Amino acid sequence: MDIDDEYFNDPEFQLLIQKYLKYLLESLREVKANLYNRDFEKLRQFGHNLKGVAGGYGFDELSKLGGKIETVSSSENFDFLKNLISDFEASLKKRMPPV
């Protein structure tokens, strides 16, 4: 067994993952508000944090989206950001456990 497998399968780590996903889902409303208020700096910060943290939880796709959100926020491209936020929401929701 790979040490990474052991780490990612740890019940305590799985609990942290679920808490992080819940945090991201709760952040989605604020992210959308920042988009429609064209607060590109807050979106850039969100993307930067997502890029840095999501990968540590094994969410490479979310991490890559965070990097794109960070970069595109700097260019203030509203339409592209809107698409990236939609991609983020879809990617996040497919990772949420069924209720």
Language model: regions and residue ranges:
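Two-component system phosphorelay core
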Residues: 1-99
